Structures are given as structure tokens and as C-alpha cells.
């Protein structure tokens, strides 16, 4: 599938054919607009409301047509605040969907849902734009090769490996480390793979978006001296934005990623933080449009909306989009319709555990709940598969023994089980890892661990060769060699204290 870009500026498409209309009703971010007979806009067309507010300031609000109501009226959702709008204001139909800038000029820049730069660095140096509403690639254009996408994060690469060109979900409640993990992945992929990333901030905190931007400038992912050499484009529609912007900002980010895949023929990483906010915004818009709510108050079109976004994220014969999506889980309930609908589209799930975070084990990835369709011997190889299965079996047995340990203590276990518990605790700690993006908080330098080194480390723990080392030696280290060096340092410190 090739993009057929237009050559207008960013934001709404500026075609010659413009239909005049008038605002007849405003309900929050939803507008009803009347058009002359025979001049009705199409669904998803971009409308622009123009006029002046009560103090004479110009108003220029972009909207998207959602419903045709009859009697020459349409219902549209605003992409920015509707304060100052009044009935009777002039509305222009642009004749096309919202179009955003695409290509290399977007790298290192921050955009809003309309593709307008919001980083005070001036206009985007490109005339190439693309509409945000497009069909998914045809079946014959898809690439079906299976290969692992190495992240340098031990727990991910060993137990729930990511597929190149696949979709990965980061599941977790509030405050367990989803955004930090995403920042680390962007950092590792830019440094280890030299890949281009697009980050879609959908309905998350503005402070986090600002922190991410500053962090990227510090780490060199965004090149301050030469913006063109940056490795990521940022698209933000944060918590304070109207639901229309939060609902469409994911499509804006995806459109930019599709250009890198289809025209530049690159492998792209698309980060969406947070896909739940996309669903939440759709739910708000659905209620404002008067649709009957479905299960737990969600929109009846939940599966359709999710599918239209997710099916465009795929690998073609030109290139691939590997998507990593943070999924907020309401009240830590994985059966909620929003995370449950997301599950159906994913190749791998990385589940973050509040229990592990409470223990101080970061990344707090649950090794037993996290899954991947890639963890098969024919894809990852026998050695990787066997090591991962043995790690999971050891941790599962430790989990089963925890009730007995809590009631009776370790001494009541058999010798075999005591040994298993000791190894499981070492494994649990060795699954932790210092992050590059958390260096300023932890004081520990970040570590990128290759897959072969990860497998070797866990094999040594499982074999019993390291049974004599204290478990704290395995906490927040990179490779197994660092763990043995840390054990020697701990022993020396202990001897000095004596």
C-alpha cells in the first residue's frame, strides 16, 4: 500500500472546494452545523469554524464530521477547545479529512492532533501531508516472516520476546512503570538498532510528555544541534485536550509511522501511551453523539474503533511498524472491556505487577503473566525456549510454596524445595535491571543485555553453579558477570565490617 500524499500545509486539508455552513448547536466539544442543500460534507471531513470571540480574538477551531443528521445538518467533534464559539458562526468544509505532515522533517518535532508543531521551533519543513483516515494494507501486501525484536531488557527478551512488526501491550495499573519502560525501549532501540520511532501521547499527563521530550534531548534521541538527525517524532494529545483530539491523536501518530514504512521503506517503532485513553475518549465522544452505551458504559463501536487503528499497524513487504502500547488497566481488572478488546490484537503482552514494584524489582514485569506468541522452539530455538520454560517452572513452584513458607517458614520445606526457593529468589532479582532513563533517580548506570548473554546468565543460575552467591548480588545488575563481581564486593565489605 502506497501513500498518495497531498502537498498542502499541516492541519486540515486546504482544498479549493469550500462549503459554507453555520453553527446551530454547541454541546461541549460537539457541534451541530447546518449546510445549504446539496452541499453536505462527507463523514470524517474536516470542518473549520471561523469567527471572533467576545473580546475580538480570532477563532479557528477544527472539527471532524461524525454524523449526518438529516435536514442538511451534520454533527462534528471539535479537535480543540470550544470556548468562545457561538451559534451562527461560519463553518468551512475543507472537502477532505484532517491531513498531517509526514516524512523526515517530522523527526525531532512535537505535533498536536492536526499535525501543527507545538514546540516553538517554527514551521515544519515539508509540503508532503497525508490524511489520518486510511484503509489497512491489503492482505497480499503483508509480510509474514517471523523474527525476534531484541530490546536489551532481560525479562522481556527471555520470557515474552517481541515480534519484529508485531503489536505488544504493556499492561499495568497506575504508577507501576509503564511510561519508564516505554522511554527505555525508545532509548535502546535508537541506540542499538538506529531505528526511527513515532511516539503517540494519547490522553496522558502533560508533565510526562514534557519529561519525555527533555529526556530524549539529553540522551541524544532528539538531536538539539541538528534536529534532522533525531530518531523520533512526537505527537501529543494530552489529558487536558478535548475528547476529539484524544480520540484522533493515535491516528495522527500512526499516519506519520506509515509514511516511514511505505515510502521510506523503513522499520519503524510506534509507541502509544496510552491505548486505554484512546478507548476512553471514544467513549466520551460516543455519549456526546447520543449513542446507547454498551458493557460497563463503553461505546457500542469499541471493537470497530480498536480494529480500525490496530489493523493499520502491521508489516508490509516495504517495511514494518512494531507497535508498543501502554494499556492502563482500570482497577487492575484485566476483564474490563477496554484491555480485553486490546488483548485480541496483540502478539505479546508485558504485564507489570504492583507486587514486584512494591518489592523494588524494576522493571516490574510479571514473568508468569507476561506472554508472547514468539516463545516457540521453531522461532526462538530450543536453547532459548528450554531456558525460558525452566525459569517459569521455577518461579511457578516458588509461587505455590509461598503460602507454606508464610505459615510454617522455610525450615519446614524439603531440602529440594529450599534449594528451588533460593534459586527462584535469585532469578526474581536477576530479572531486575538498571535503566538508562532512570540513571538520574537510581545513580546506577543503565545496562543493555544481549539475548545470548541473558540466556547464559539464567542457565548458570538454574544449573546451581551460583548457589553459593548471596541473592542481593543479583539485584539491579546487567550481565551474570556483574552479579558475580557484585557478590565478591559484598563479601569484601562483609569481611571489612568484621
Swiss-Prot record:
Function: Produces ATP from ADP in the presence of a proton gradient across the membrane. The catalytic sites are hosted primarily by the beta subunits.
The family this protein is said to belong to: Belongs to the ATPase alpha/beta chains family.
Topological relation to the membrane, as annotated: Peripheral membrane protein
Keywords in alphabetical order: ATP synthesis, ATP-binding, CF(1), Chloroplast, Hydrogen ion transport, Ion transport, Membrane, Nucleotide-binding, Plastid, Thylakoid, Translocase, Transport
GO BP term, pick one: proton motive force-driven mitochondrial ATP synthesis
EC number: 7.1.2.2
Keyword Glycoprotein included in the entry's annotation: no
Organism this protein belongs to: Solanum lycopersicum (Tomato)
Subcellular location: Plastid, Chloroplast thylakoid membrane
Cysteine pairs bridged by disulfides in the record: none
Superkingdom classification of source: Eukaryota
Name this polypeptide is given: ATP synthase subunit beta, chloroplastic
Subunit details: F-type ATPases have 2 components, CF(1) - the catalytic core - and CF(0) - the membrane proton channel. CF(1) has five subunits: alpha(3), beta(3), gamma(1), delta(1), epsilon(1). CF(0) has four main subunits: a(1), b(1), b'(1) and c(9-12).
Designated gene of the protein: atpB
